Amino acid sequence: MSQAELISGCFKNDKTAKKQFFDTYFSKLAYISLRYSKNAVQSEQALLQSFSQVFSKLNAFKSQSTVTFDDFVKNEFIFYTVNYIKGIRNEYYVASTVKAVEYTEKTYDLFLDSKFIDVHNINQDLLLKSIQALVPSQRLVFNLLVIDNFTLAQASELLDTSEQSIKSTLEKARFNLQKSIENNLKISSNEQPV
């Protein structure tokens, strides 16, 4: 079934098209949901809600001529997942209480004592576990900017906060992720038999 047939079939409520859409995208989006969520339970709730919302918005793809269908589905899913996480008020709260000042040079290095870890060349289970350990605001910002390649302006708009707050949160997320990965690597190396 071609992409056009898939989209058309989904509009017509065709069960075969719906099943193919589900089979094609569900596992990809499930992993994205895991990255944005703190655990499997929250991920499942976000996945089910966001997946159904993406499915209901497929008709909006027609006007999106510069984006591939896969990217459209992924970006819409991320948008709904982020909004779901933001909707958990007892967990997600970001407030900018200090006016950020932009410096042209850094006078410190968060990673002075350790090698910076490339997130694309690390064990994905270890990375997922470490990302899920971040506080929600850091988890969202890190996923948006580093893994999903959103621009600073896009992340700022989606999270409804200033670009300076996003930069600050990203720096904290990188630091905390680095430390979490280092700790998880130490734990896993101690657990392996010699």
Predicted feature locations:
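Short amphipathic alpha-helical boundary/capping segments
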Residues: 5-10, 126-134
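Sigma70-family region 2
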Residues: 11-12, 48-66
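Residue-level signal for the short linker/turn that defines the boundary of a DNA-recognition helix
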Residues: 16, 27, 38, 67, ...
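Arg/Lys-rich amphipathic alpha helix in sigma70-family domain 2
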Residues: 60-62, 75-97
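A short, charge-rich alpha-helical start-of-domain segment used by transcription regulators
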Residues: 8-31, 35
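Internal acidic/polar
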Residues: 92-120
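Residue-level preference for hydrophobic side chains embedded in well-ordered alpha helices
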Residues: 21, 25, 29, 50, ...
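DNA-recognition helix of helix-turn-helix
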Residues: 127-130, 136-138, 144-147, 152-187
